Regions:
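CheY-like receiver
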Residues: 41-97
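Conserved sequence signature across two-component system core domains
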Residues: 7-8, 34, 52
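Hydrophobic/aromatic residues located in beta-strands of well-ordered beta-sheets
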Residues: 30-31, 79
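Short helix-capping segments at alpha-helix termini
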Residues: 23-27, 73-75
Length: 97
């Protein structure tokens, strides 16, 4: 099974993603959640997820900074960025390939 890490500072988003997606149908499981990029980095070290779903705008460390920090150590991780920003150029700064 693929392990998924969800990082968002809105608990309702984390819980909604956990409950609304039929993870097992896609051979996935939500291995953990975090409420900011710093917590996400710590969870990465413990869980070694295959897929990261993260908000862009969070306190302490935003999603873009977290993705930049993990890219060298986890080059094969699949990343999905969540954003409420209308201007997609902000999300493109993540340089996701």
């Amino acid at each position: 099974m693929y392990k998924v890490l969800i990082v968002d500072d809105e608990p309702i988003i984390c819980e909604g993603l956990r409950k609304s997606v039929k993870w097992e149908k896609h051979n996935c499981e939500v291995a953990g959640t975090a409420s900011n990029g710093l917590e996400g980095l710590e969870q990465m070290k413990v869980l070694h997820p295959d897929i990261l779903i993260t908000d862009i705008s969070m306190n302490n460390m935003d999603g873009l900074a977290m993705v930049a920090a993990i890219r060298s150590e986890y080059p094969d991780i699949e990343v999905c960025l969540l954003t409420g920003y209308r201007n997609f150029e902000y999300a493109q700064r993540a340089s996701l390939g």
